[in-house]
Amino acid sequence: MSAANPETPNSTISREASTQSSSAAASQGYVLPEGKIMPNTVFVGGIDVRMDETEIRSFFARYGSVKEVKIITDRTGVSKGYGFVSFFNDVDVQKIVESQINFHGKKLKLGPAIRKQNLCAYHVQPRPLVFNHPPPPQFQNVWTNPNTETYMQPPTTMNPITQYVQAYPTYPNSPVQVITGYQLPVYNYQMPPQWPVGEQRSYVVPPAYSAVNYHCNEVDPGAEVVPNECSVHEATPPSGNGPQKKSVDRSIQTVVSCLFNPENRLRNTVVTQDDYFKDKRVHHFRRSRAMLKSV
């Protein structure tokens, strides 16, 4: 006893319609794509840009009650030249496809409407835009020296080629270490606090003494001094601006006349620095008698 699976009338009609549509499409010179044939729907190609859905609906109304007319357009709304016409009731799609239809003097390309299978929808997830912000300014303390602080600042964006790094010392009385830019040698500038803030800057140089030997003999007042060997230390004038500034040209041999009192005259003795300045305050130098002929 064999069991037979009876076929429904709808499946038989659908298979026959598909076969007829395939043969009709092959007779018109094009091959149908693989997919599911949409019932009661006709593919219409060769649509002129001047045609609208209302005209197409009124034209295909002769074949049955038109359900929908869809003209495919691009993103700008311009027709791509083809569309679909669907009917409410069962219509003879094969009869419509085999008919030669000219609309506005242009032959329409008709065929069964086929929905393609295995359609892959490609969804691309948009990537978020990431903006690289410049790093925030960094302030670091160098503990190698308790009075030394390091200040770092990122380069400004005003000029993309040249980068400037500026240091901001907050303590003017403390040494400041300046770091200049990226991948550059580090220069340490040590500024010792020699004066408080707001005070006039002055440089104090300790006086230096050089030994000068003079030859002096006993002379009467008013006579020229004959040099005799004696050791006198001459003070070098300070480099700062003072009320009394004297310069000594060491390239010229200078002999200083010494006029001593008879009570304090010394013979062939060494005159110390204190005695020299004491005698200098007592006796006045006279340039007319002080300059001697150099030997």
UniProtKB/Swiss-Prot annotation:
Residues 167-190 form the DAZ domain. GO terms for cellular component: cytoplasm; nucleus; protein-containing complex; ribosome. One of its GO terms (molecular function) is mRNA 3'-UTR binding. InterPro entries: DAZ_dom, DAZ_RRM_vert, Nucleotide-bd_a/b_plait_sf, RBD_domain_sf, RRM_dom. Residues 80-132 are annotated as: Homodimerization. Testis specific. GO terms for biological process: 3'-UTR-mediated mRNA stabilization; female meiosis II; oocyte maturation; positive regulation of meiotic nuclear division; positive regulation of translational initiation; spermatogenesis. The keyword Nucleus applies. Residues 40-115 form the RRM domain. Residues 1-25 are annotated as: Disordered. Residues 1-10 have a biased composition (Polar residues). Belongs to the RRM DAZ family. The DAZ domain mediates the interaction with DAZAP1 and DAZAP2. This is Deleted in azoospermia-like. It comes from Macaca fascicularis (Crab-eating macaque).
